[in-house]
Amino acid sequence: MPSTDLLKLKDFEPYLEILEAYSTKAKNYVNGYCTKYEPWQLIAGSVLCTLLVVWVYELIFQPESLWSRFKNKLFRLIRKMPFIGRKIQQQLTKAKKDLVKNMPFLKLDKDYVKTLPAQGLSTAEVLERLKEYSSMDVFWQEGKASGAVYSGEPKLTELLVQAYGEFTWSNPLHPDIFPGLRKLEAEIVRMTCSLFNGGPDSCGCVTSGGTESILMACKAYRDLALEKGIKTPEIVAPESAHAAFDKAAHYFGMKIVRVAQKKNMEVDVRAMKRAISRNTAMLVCSAPQFPHGVIDPIPEVAKLAVKYKIPFHVDACLGGFLIVFMEKAGYPLEKPFDFRVKGVTSISADTHKYGYAPKGSSVVMYSNEKYRKYQFFVDADWQGGIYASPSIAGSRPGGIIAACWAALMHFGENGYVEATKQIIKTARFLKSELENIKNIFILGDPQLSVIALGSNDFDIYRLSNMMSAKGWNFNYLQFPRSIHFCITLVHTRKRVAIQFLKDIRESVTQIMKNPKAKTTGMGAIYGMAQATIDRKMVAEISSVFLDSLYSTDPVTQGNQMNGSPKPR
């Protein structure tokens, strides 16, 4: 009795005969058509067709989308048109001048030092000069600056200065010369991994800041993806994820795929799932994200990471040293965010923010050394010997590492819990009061220290301008148009929060007398930037800001940056 498989095969025999007949007919047609061409023509045609296919493929499949490249090309052509180009250039020049006018930090009444002094200055003279420079700063001690300075407590400052002085000349590039410094750095990493519930295999590195921590994680996953055969590794990140991920994509030849947010400003997990492709090198969430202070749904995204076997980075640069103490401070978070979540493979956390270490220190952590090894750079063939570096920099300031260690040891768990309690208490108070102020609203549901404000009744940038006139400093946000304020230990001091709310209420009341009035100053510049379709023009204008940071040209005296200048 014939088997079932043979019976099934016989059922397809008529179809196979038809297929064979058509293939023979097609073959004969092609052979007949090609008889009028010489062999060299067929070879040349094949080569040209192959080159054309490769060219079309490379044209379409690039890190920058075809639509984006088309728009950029179109805008470049428009700017070259005689009349339109001149008009655009005039507006561009005006925007640059307006930007410079609104850079108060350029308006100093002191001459710039442009050459070395012929005779070196004494210690007293150098310190006196430095006091002159520090007197130009905003008087942030009043608590009117958003973020920027996270403690500033005099006794802590004294400790950090002494710790830095102890290791001023040390460099972790030479662990054989500075073994004590190596021990300090290793202990910083281990303490931080423990705070984020890393297991015995967890590891990390100390970096110069949040951006470098993010860059290092992206570099590690880029190299891992390349090893797997992915030619253009992709970073799948929320729209709200830090711009350092764009920087990493730019530096490392990656492509960033931005994923939409929901109305509550959390990343849309379904949209993130749709964004995953065979080129995805890493997934990203924030805890919290910088613009609105909202924590992304980390456990849900972690499930995607596990399902598709993709590394998953949690960016906790801003609030890392708050979220780990929230539960003990009496403000437990609804969802886990650290290495307890299966699928989380790396975390970045800034010690120089709510860790209260001096600027220039952060930690990037990995769940396992198998990820960290891709972060390292090793050149085994250099004439100067085998060169190995854990992060971007070669030489690094040992003083910063020592001061970071000193801050961690000085605060201890109890100190951080108490600081977190004060900050979150102040933030929750401000949040509850701001929710009751008419004509403004809070974006999302911030659980930590950042509160973003918007308005449906007036240009929210006007509120920032008006608060600036009262000495306050806000951060401008875009898409959607909004502003935010970041609460630190400085803002927990007596009456700072009360004064903040008083000035907000007064400013909103004043604005609502003429809600449609034109926005001026930096608010107008940000408004213009958000409305500009050609983003290359916005980048060109922004470069003026960067150029100005290195300007040594004298500018007429004016006010300092948003905030109260120090008394002279």
From Swiss-Prot:
The keyword Protease does not apply. The modification N6-acetyllysine is found at residue 353. Pathway: Lipid metabolism; sphingolipid metabolism. GO terms for biological process: androgen metabolic process; apoptotic signaling pathway; ceramide metabolic process; estrogen metabolic process; face morphogenesis; fatty acid metabolic process; female gonad development; fibroblast migration. It is a single-pass type III membrane protein. Belongs to the group II decarboxylase family. Sphingosine-1-phosphate lyase subfamily. This is Sphingosine-1-phosphate lyase 1. It comes from Rattus norvegicus (Rat).
